[in-house]
Amino acid sequence: QEKKKIILSGSDYLSLFCDRDWLSEAIDNIVKNAFDHTESGAVIGITWRALPSGIQIVVKDNGCGIHPEDIHHIFKRFYRSRFSKDTQGIGLGLPLAKAVIEAHGGAIEVDSELGRGTSFTINFLIPTKL
């Protein structure tokens, strides 16, 4: 029993024109990554909100964090950190998530601090009429 907690927080009234299955798969991969790299009792937060120019989704955990030498490589296919060899996976979850998010016109950023956790921020712009 890992006893990890997910906290969901956001507006009930946001909508995003997207391929629901693929975008769900992308976010699932990010959340699974958080589960894989947190200890028992960890908290994983998933928040979403409207911004003036779009929609933002944040997946944040209080896990071990991503080592600075790895942070610029985590979206490369088949990349596995030497610090994550004890977890399952082949290094395709985050690259797939990034590809799906970008195919939807979005962008993903990662911020991490060793021993404090990691935050993935996804932004989707809302098209405006000119």
Describe each PLM feature range.
Residues 66-78, 98:
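Short conserved segment of the HATPase_c
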Residues 105-106:
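Conserved glycine-rich
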Residues 15-18:
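Conserved micro-motifs of the catalytic ATP-binding
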